[in-house]
């Protein structure tokens, strides 16, 4: 059996689920990780009803650093080669900074930043030994703009973008691509559960984003932004004065 796998975090719903379905459709074996075991089982069942691949499930809360150690150890002990790691798991919150519980803010940092860093730290050496691999870190269009009322979330995604690009320069000499992929607003439960107000945004279909991400990963694109409208936001943030971008983005968030 082919022991090469694509590992996807946050795979029980939304973008992660769509990515799992897309990679499965292309014959990729999967390691799916999320907190909710029942939802993972449903994703697996639905995929295997139409795809002939191998799927491993791990029910872990990646905001717990020990869980990441257990995940990596399980992959090693089962001789699963992670040829592609997709760090998709993340959480967010919208509101005035001190109106959001500090614990919630710290959880955003723990999952969106610390867990992602540790996943890279543990799995990159294996890819380095193999002389090949792809790490795809899912950032966000908010990485380009300091969104008021999403201060910690947007800042966490700015970290992901900067970290990923720096990491790519370090590891490309080993045959490893570290890709940054930026979705915009997507029609998933993530945005509703985070309390984001989306009345001014036309959200993308997660399946459409998954197809885009698959192509970007297979073509080893180092940096990708989904949808033309999101590319315009990134360009707008780049060419206009920082003060102007900050003020306008705050009005957009209200």
Predicted feature descriptions by range:
Residues 120, 156:
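Active-site helix of classical SDR
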Residues 180, 196-234:
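C-terminal helical subdomain
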Residues 96-97, 104-109:
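Substrate-binding pocket helix/loop in short-chain dehydrogenase/reductase
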Residues 26-42:
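Conserved glycine-rich Rossmann-like NAD(P)H-binding loop of the short-chain dehydrogenase/reductase
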Residues 10-14:
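Conserved glycine-rich cofactor-binding loop
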